[in-house]
Amino acid sequence: MSQRLIGQTMFSVRHGTEHRAERALQDLAGLLPASAGHMNHRVLRSFGMSPLGSALRDEGREAALGDVHFVFETEWDSLEAHDEFYSSQSVQQIYGTLHSILTSGPFEVLYDAVVEEPQHDNAAV
């Protein structure tokens, strides 16, 4: 039986190279609508750190902001659909364009939903 899952691919790049990462992520996002099993996606870029939500001391927060962090979040109706997308030649080529600018990652964590807000006409209620 298929199980819906969410994948979050995380990576960091040097300041000044974020435009290259954004272009690669736009290319990846462009492949998703035609992918079997794709349900949803979003691309996130860091802009700061929360002193309230972070356990890092001041110097740790500053060090962590030395790079630009990205999250490529995808939602799939099955692990098989996810794996088919990520093993494709097109995705691997796009990932290859990132290697020269990465400071960490990419790595992906897979999730299944534990708590979700109820939906009504595609809006949380």
Residue ranges, per PLM feature:
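Short strand-loop junctions, especially beta-strand C-caps/beta-turns
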Residues: 10-16, 79
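Active-site-flanking beta-strand signature of metal-NTP-handling nucleotidyl enzymes
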Residues: 5-12, 71-72
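Internal catalytic or translocation cores that form aromatic/hydrophobic pockets or channels
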Residues: 68
